Design a protein with these regions (language model features):
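C-terminal and inter-domain tail/linker signature
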Residues: 1-140
Length: 140
């Protein structure tokens, strides 16, 4: 599966091209809003989402039949943005399931600003490696 092309069609809200990536019985979970979609529901939710979108794929990790992506998504006017971490489970090079975690970008809460905590690249790598290990059943 070409995950770069998949994200391109997600952002372009191209229903016909998106459908080609999925197994017939695939499903998608949006955990932050407790939503569970079959393929048709997911494509409808994505393609009918208001606005015009763009973004960039910031990171991709692969392990067996699993692909993990971190993407930055925003409207074309860049008035706000989101980050999404997606776990793709594949079967015969098609998407069997996606588990996604969407979060709106913003400022740190006031109580934490004085801590001046920044997410370093090393910490981001460690977090993604731990997530990949958990998904692959590897003990760290």
């Amino acid at each position: 599966m070409d995950v770069i092309e998949f994200w391109r069609y997600v952002l372009e809200q191209d229903a016909d091209r998106l459908r080609e990536f999925f197994c017939e019985d695939a499903y998608v979970n949006w955990h932050c809003t407790n939503e569970h979609f079959n393929v048709n529901e997911y494509i409808r939710a994505n393609c009918e989402y208001p606005g015009e979108w763009t973004g960039e794929l910031e990171r991709t990790e692969k392990a067996g039949d699993m692909i993990i992506t971190a993407a930055h998504v925003y409207p074309k006017d860049k008035s706000w943005s989101l980050h999404v971490t997606s776990f793709f489970k594949l079967e015969d090079s098609k998407i069997k399931s996606i588990d996604e975690y969407w979060a709106e970008d913003g400022e740190a809460p006031e109580w934490r600003k004085s801590l001046k905590v920044k997410l370093s690249n090393n910490l981001l790598v460690a977090v993604l490696q731990a997530m990949l290990a958990v998904c692959s059943g590897i003990k760290m």
